[in-house]
Structures are given as structure tokens and as C-alpha cells.
């Protein structure tokens, strides 16, 4: 018997691209959403998680049975926990304690060990602790923030999928920026196909907090980030991102997280500035891992 998907790992990628139906954009523009929550562990991070582990294996840097360590705000941790379960690794994940209960529970459900740092220490503190644990010989850090296999996963899969699905007509790509792996890899691929494609990054405005993305201090800026691969950065208020997240669920039937709502909010803004554009925004995960945060409790 030949199976199309022999293992759960084979289900990663080739996610749907759908058209925005009801939220207001300029009528001459085509607004499209890449549904990365359809990946088996529920987010765009399934792609780099498998890439980082598989390519490290091919280089002989890690072997089944090793202990892997990673600092994460949520989605990468869940994806790595899944990948570690598939491939036989022990996974230690370090994250801020203000992350949603659902994300914490998903990691431990896959068998990962979870270490929490304080909200005040944040992702910077989580990253520092991961490095100290590696130095103490407690495991090997994959380091999504500096690991070239992170953007490479999007260069070889996400970018080509978007180009194929839009039949080469894409004019704008919009993505929230956390590790920046998605936007770096997709930008590289799309710009190789058409240098005119505009790459738009999203970050929280000063004083705003949007789960999964950061406004990094210079000393913690991901090493994989290359500023010249992004044409424009949009600062987004938490309130606007949350509002669009709720509207996506209630008006489009698309249940996603706040960073995805922020990406769509940025796309709606941009749509008012141009005509005859084909815009693609990344819907990086699903809304069920944010239910306990209360963002969906606000009235219509």
C-alpha cells in the first residue's frame, strides 16, 4: 500500500491559500491568507522545526536520544515538541510564564519538559538560560534565532507554495516578525522570482504586546534577520491586532492568533494605498491556543 502521507511529518506544508471575503479592502485588490494553522502541530513553525532537526541530523550534529533545548514563546516549542516525539529526542523548552495555558499544555502533551522564566525576563531571559544550559552540558540548543535552517525551510517550501498558488501574480507579502525566519525565507524566494514583490514585516508598536512577535532590542535581534530583505515595517497596536483577530473569526470564519490578526490588519491598511494588487498574509497559527487569554471574549 502506498500512502500519500506515510508519517505525520509528511503532512507539514502545502497549506491552503484562501481569499478574504468580507473584511474591507480596496475592491480592485485580491487579499489572500495562507492558512499555516493547518499544519499538524498547528502553526507555521512546523516547517522550521522539522528543518532544524532533520538538517542537523544530516550534518551529524545531533542523534536520536539526544536532549535538545530551545527558547520559545510558544509555536516553535509546540512544533519542536512534535518533531522530537517523531524522531526520538528529549525536548526541553524554555518560555516566559505569561504564555497562554494552551501553548504550555500542548508542549507537555507532546512529552516536552517545560521550564518557565518570569514575564520580566521575557524571551531574552529564556534565550540566555538556554545558552547557559547548553554550556553546562544539559543539551544542544537549536537556536531558531541564529539557525539558517529556519529561513531555509521557508525558502524551500513556503515561498514556492505561495508563488505557485498565486500563479506568480503576488505583489505584496505580509508577515508578522518573531524569529523572522518566515519573512526572511519567503522574501529571498519571492525576490528571486520577481524583484518588484513588496515584503512587509509587522512588529508591535512601542508599548504593545502581541503574542509570538517582538520588537527586539538591538543586542537580541535575531542573527538570521537581514534588514534589506524587508521593504517596509508596519508598527501595530495590540488593540488593532486583537480587533481584526476577532473579526476574522466572526466575519470570515478564520480562527487564528493575534499575530495573524495583526498581519491582516496591516494588509487592510496597505490595501487602501494601492490598486490591482495581489496580497498574501501569513495566518501563522490557530486561535484555540489563545482562548484562555480572553481576547475572544469581547462583544461584537
Where are these regions (language model features)?
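PLP-dependent amino-acid enzyme catalytic core
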Residues: 1-300
Amino acid at each position: 500500500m502506498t500512502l500519500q502521507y506515510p508519517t505525520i511529518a509528511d503532512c507539514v506544508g502545502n497549506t491552503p491559500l484562501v481569499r478574504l471575503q468580507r473584511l474591507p479592502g480596496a475592491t480592485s485588490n485580491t487579499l489572500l491568507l495562507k492558512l499555516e494553522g493547518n499544519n499538524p502541530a498547528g502553526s507555521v513553525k512546523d516547517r522550521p522545526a522539522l528543518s532544524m532537526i532533520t538538517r542537523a541530523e544530516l550534518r551529524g550534529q545531533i542523534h536520536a536520544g539526544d536532549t535538545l533545548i530551545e527558547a520559545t514563546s510558544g509555536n516553535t516549542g509546540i512544533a519542536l515538541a512534535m518533531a522530537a516525539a517523531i524522531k526520538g529526542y528529549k525536548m526541553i523548552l524554555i518560555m516566559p510564564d505569561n504564555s497562554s495555558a494552551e501553548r504550555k499544555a500542548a508542549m507537555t502533551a507532546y512529552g516536552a519538559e517545560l521550564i518557565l522564566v518570569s514575564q520580566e525576563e521575557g524571551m531574552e531571559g529564556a534565550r540566555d538560560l538556554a545558552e547557559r544550559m547548553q554550556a553546562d552540558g544539559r543539551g544542544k540548543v537549536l537556536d531558531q534565532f541564529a539557525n539558517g535552517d529556519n529561513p531555509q525551510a521557508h525558502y524551500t517550501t513556503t515561498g514556492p507554495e505561495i508563488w505557485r498558488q498565486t500563479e506568480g501574480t503576488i505583489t505584496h507579502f505580509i508577515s508578522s516578525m518573531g524569529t523572522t525566519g518566515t519573512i526572511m525565507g519567503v522574501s529571498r524566494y519571492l525576490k528571486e522570482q520577481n524583484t518588484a514583490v513588496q515584503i512587509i514585516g509587522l512588529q508591535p508598536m512601542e508599548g504593545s504586546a502581541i503574542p509570538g512577535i517582538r520588537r527586539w532590542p538591538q543586542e537580541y535581534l535575531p542573527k538570521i534577520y537581514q534588514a534589506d530583505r524587508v521593504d517596509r515595517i508596519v508598527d501595530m497596536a495590540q488593540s488593532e491586532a486583537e480587533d481584526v483577530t476577532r473579526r476574522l473569526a466572526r466575519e470570515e470564519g478564520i480562527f487564528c492568533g493575534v499575530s495573524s490578526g495583526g498581519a491582516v490588519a496591516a494588509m487592510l491598511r496597505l490595501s487602501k494605498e494601492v490598486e490591482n494588487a495581489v496580497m498574501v498574509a501569513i495566518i501563522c497559527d490557530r486561535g484555540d491556543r489563545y482562548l484562555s487569554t480572553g481576547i475572544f471574549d469581547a462583544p461584537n
